[in-house]
Amino acid sequence: MANDSPAKSLVDIDLSSLRDPAGIFELVEVVGNGTYGQVYKGRHVKTVTAAIKVMDVTEDEEEEITLEINMLKKYSHHRNIATYYGAFIKKSPPGHDDQLWLVMEFCGAGSITDLVKNTKGNTLKEDWIAYISREILRGLAHLHIHHVIHRDIKGQNVLLTENAEVKLVDFGVSAQLDRTVGRRNTFIGTPYWMAPEVIACDENPDATYDYRSDLWSCGITAIEMAEGGPPLCDMHPMRALFLIPRNPPPRLKSKKWSKKFFSFIEGCLVKNYMQRPSTEQLLKHPFIRDQPNERQVRIQLKDHIDRTRKKRGEKDETEYEYSGSEEEEEEVPEQEGEPSSIVNVPGESTLRRDFLRLQQENKERSEALRRQQLLQEQQLREQEEYKRQLLAERQKRIEQQKEQRRRLEEQQRREREARRQQEREQRRREQEEKRRLEELERRRKEEEERRRAEEEKRRVEREQEYIRRQLEEEQRHLEILQQQLLQEQAMLLHDHRRPHAQQQPPPPQQQDRSKPSFHAPEPKPHYDPADRAREVQWSHLASLKNNVSPVSRSHSFSDPSPKFAHHHLRSQDPCPPSRSEGLSQSSDSKSEVPEPTQKAWSRSDSDEVPPRVPVRTTSRSPVLSRRDSPLQGGGQQNSQAGQRNSTSSIEPRLLWERVEKLVPRPGSGSSSGSSNSGSQPGSHPGSQSGSGERFRVRSSSKSEGSPSPRQESAAKKPDDKKEVFRSLKPAGEVDLTALAKELRAVEDVRPPHKVTDYSSSSEESGTTDEEEEDVEQEGADDSTSGPEDTRAASSPNLSNGETESVKTMIVHDDVESEPAMTPSKEGTLIVRQTQSASSTLQKHKSSSSFTPFIDPRLLQISPSSGTTVTSVVGFSCDGLRPEAIRQDPTRKGSVVNVNPTNTRPQSDTPEIRKYKKRFNSEILCAALWGVNLLVGTESGLMLLDRSGQGKVYPLISRRRFQQMDVLEGLNVLVTISGKKDKLRVYYLSWLRNKILHNDPEVEKKQGWTTVGDLEGCVHYKVVKYERIKFLVIALKSSVEVYAWAPKPYHKFMAFKSFGELLHKPLLVDLTVEEGQRLKVIYGSCAGFHAVDVDSGSVYDIYLPTHIQCSIKPHAIIILPNTDGMELLVCYEDEGVYVNTYGRITKDVVLQWGEMPTSVAYIRSNQTMGWGEKAIEIRSVETGHLDGVFMHKRAQRLKFLCGRNDKVFFSSVRSGGSSQVYFMTLGRTSLLSW
């Protein structure tokens, strides 16, 4: 290369004497940015391509630009430095700076940074790195010999020619050393490659450095070629400037490199520059010196350059970056270039000589140019005047165009506003239309309900009318039957006297009572015929009195006295029991004699009265309940007609059994038992099972109604005495047996549930803690409840017949269950759970673990009788136990519905479900991924498929997952995982492929990466502010702040670090005050503290001094609508309202009912606390209690995650197994809280 260029001092360079480049060079396109100007790809009109740096010459920069030209002119004549060809001045109109064109050698293969980016794995081979590093050191040795520091060595300032030659460029920050001092103290360069002594110049004005700072940058560039980027490149540049002087020297991360390479890096990166080897010493290093295959390396580099250009070729020629110190540009695509060859391009030396000759001619002609300029000044002034006019007109046109654009933009803005207004109006109309349709639908449903109610009322009236007619017909029949029986009685007495007048009656002690006779009932010896006639007459009259009193049945069903019926009879007649009474008693006691006995017809006064069966306090059946009112009315009419009332009704009971058969009752066998009505004054609160009650009612009806068919058959054959006696019982027995069969057939076809059915099953539905084992049911994981969530029963605690409308709180488990609700004495709603089969009431195991105590506002209680329940649930510190709030044992587990006509949609009701899957180890965290749930345990990561059958897919095993969050928009899962509690980021596409196995390319890639080198992470929080996603991390004794960097980085990069904190952080969050100031809020065992991100100052927000020992912080809740200034901090069993400066904002302390294990902020401005005895829901604004879910036994629960109205939490049972609970908070309920 030419070395004959005379060295000139700075004063010898006269910028005004440079020629205009017009006709010599022309610009083609921009290829990069330098420190003082843009770099163009240019073309010499007669020879080849050149690099042209175009700079505006201002008075402030004239000295620096002159210095750069001087450096290039003197020291660019080296094979490893881009050659300086010449400089030109392009004149500009008055008022504008002239342009300096700096023409240099064009390196067509781009920079080392481009080479690394275009290489697989973003790493170069070790022999390539050795070759490039040697060429860099040779160029630096040339500069250092001449006492010049480059000061900006980095990958982008090391270029390659098409022949794989290495050239140093960009002398924009180079400086010549003062020959006496030998050191510089100017702070300039690129941060990541900057030497520690250069950075120290900014902090200490007395600090100095020398040419060995370039050797540090050379070592960093070698690491860049080996690892794809310089150390600390994932940090903010100002953060890197802070860490480089303080961190130990960087080293190669991978172990694959040779010892010579490690040694070379170690030699370059010595922090004390006085001990750093010189350039000549590094050139003699074995890594640089021993390169036996240099020619082969150059061939490989050239072939790689050609392959990359062909692979990415989109244009005709290649363009590369010429980058400055402060700006890093994106990768520029490469294009087709000239054919590659090891031989130098012909004409290169001729071009250099031509530029030197042109430069010399410029100097000789400078004087002539000055004279010519003086002559042309007049012309220039005229031209300037003309140009000024043109510029004024042009400026005017530009202003007009701007005004037109402004008006057009204003018009477009108004049109957009009009469109938005129209869209808002359209949406408003659509919403009004939707509300109107919903109102119409609601009215239609109300109208249908009203019509159904009216139809039901009409049907009931028709049934009552039918029953009334039946009763009247039966009454008429009974009157006829009474007359026939009186006639028959007279005939029988007449016929009976004649045989007795002829026979001698035997003694009563020898009479065999065990042999019944239907032909001749033998009289007692001391009775005269008149007495016997009275006995028969009284027996018949007693049965008739019973038959004609239908209204007395209601009293017999509800009177608590078991001796009422017998007392009623004896008050009428002191005589022994009649024949019909005897028959009734023997039937009641379920006598198994196949034929009716004669004893009741011929018993003496000395006979012992058989034991009476006490009248059972039987509960009213559904049919009888519905027909109670009309019957009482009918009973009043009959009593006005002169009939006696009696409590032992026979024929009416048979009639009611017939009515029950004729009118099918829509009640279930399992739940349609009866309990005593609270309106009956003497009703007993105890109750029996429903099936048993109906059985007793039927058996009573059989026994007590049996005389009626016997009397009917007797009336048909009054002339035949023997047939009369023979037909009395068998006919009734056959009739009642058939009637019982029909009733049982009707019961079997009843629908399963009806809101008018009653059940009081204290014996069957009692639950204990021992019975709370989970009953697994296939497919019950995502089961939904049926539309009927309530059943009907009476409540002794509702006075004056008042009823309340409640919304049932559903607690789902592994089996479908039916909740029931009773208002307690304190006014608090207690939800319990009962189960019923479709036909029989069975003893079951309760699988519910929760007893909700809900604020009446939550359940939307609307009492039907005009009363309002206003009591709010209270909660004591020691917790309420379910046993303490139950009713008396006879009411335990009752099914209660206090608003039978109101059925609410399922979406309004809060639910708790438990997934069937049992995890072998404790669940530590979870996150929703779409609709499915990622579950992290002590032993791995799994996916719970909530969209299907609840299947669990294992994803990662033998790794502990402590915390996780899904960021679907970024395709990452952020976790704290592993034995060392590292912050790992998993790619969702990789996890998805582990389930689907449909992308082989994804399987080959690494599925996760770590955030920095952080270990021992305690807690983190992802905070989204506008479009920035911050990741604030609590370590054992420090807090780190990272920020997400989009493509091409696509990772979290370090933003701030706060180490050696006085209090070890346990909980961390980040707030943005008024959209301007970032503050880290963290909780420790001493209280809550804040860190100002900008200044790094740490101060206390709240220290609970009333607690002597250490505390456990639960949650930091940034209150909405406070510009990030106000907080609710929860610890132990309390919560305090403070602002970010430590001032108490509310004189309110949120007090949990017990010590919670987890506290979480949920939607609708509420917070939930999970304790061992209950789950509490409280308002985040006031701390008031909104609802409580009591546990039936103490258990440890942990909040996992939530979205909208869904909350997930887990339970840990003995042995370490866990299950996931899924809680849906009803939308309407939440909005009304």
From Swiss-Prot:
Listed Low complexity bias regions: 666-692
**Where, per the database record, does this protein carry Phosphoserine?**
5, 323, 325, 543, 619, 621, 629, 646, 691, 703, 706, 785, 794-795, 799, 817, 846, 849, 894, 907
Which family does this protein fall into? Belongs to the protein kinase superfamily. STE Ser/Thr protein kinase family. STE20 subfamily.
Which SUPFAM superfamilies does its entry note? Answer: Protein kinase-like (PK-like)
> What is said about its interaction partners and assembly?
Interacts with the SH3 domain of the adapter proteins Nck. Interacts (via its CNH regulatory domain) with ATL1 (via the N-terminal region). Interacts with RAP2A (GTP-bound form preferentially).
- Which positions does the record annotate as the modified residue N-acetylalanine? A2
Enzyme class, spelled out: transferase
Entry annotation: catalytic residues: D152 (proton acceptor)
The UniProt regions of compositional bias labelled Basic and acidic residues, in chain numbering, are 521-537, 654-663, 713-726, 741-756
Q: Could you tell me the superkingdom of the organism this chain comes from?
A: Eukaryota
Q: Which reaction does it catalyse?
A: L-seryl-[protein] + ATP = O-phospho-L-seryl-[protein] + ADP + H(+); L-threonyl-[protein] + ATP = O-phospho-L-threonyl-[protein] + ADP + H(+)
Chain positions found as Phosphothreonine: T822
Compositional bias of kind Polar residues: 544-559, 783-803
Protein name from the UniProt record = Mitogen-activated protein kinase kinase kinase kinase 4
- Which residues does the record give as ATP binding sites? V31, G32, N33, G34, T35, Y36, G37, Q38, V39, K53
Origin species:
Mus musculus (Mouse)
Per UniProt, what is one GO molecular function of this protein?
A: ATP binding
The terms describing its cellular component in GO are: cytoplasm; focal adhesion
Concerning Pfam families, the annotation shows: CNH, Pkinase
Q: What does this protein do?
A: Serine/threonine kinase that plays a role in the response to environmental stress and cytokines such as TNF-alpha. Appears to act upstream of the JUN N-terminal pathway. Activator of the Hippo signaling pathway which plays a pivotal role in organ size control and tumor suppression by restricting proliferation and promoting apoptosis. MAP4Ks act in parallel to and are partially redundant with STK3/MST2 and STK4/MST2 in the phosphorylation and activation of LATS1/2, and establish MAP4Ks as components of the expanded Hippo pathway.
In this chain, the stretch annotated as Disordered covers 305-348, 401-463, 489-805
Residues in domain CNH?
A: 920-1207
Q: Which InterPro entries match?
A: CNH_dom, Kinase-like_dom_sf, Prot_kinase_dom, Protein_kinase_ATP_BS, Ser/Thr_kinase_AS, STE20_Ser-Thr_kinase
Q: Where is this region: Mediates interaction with RAP2A?
A: 852-1206
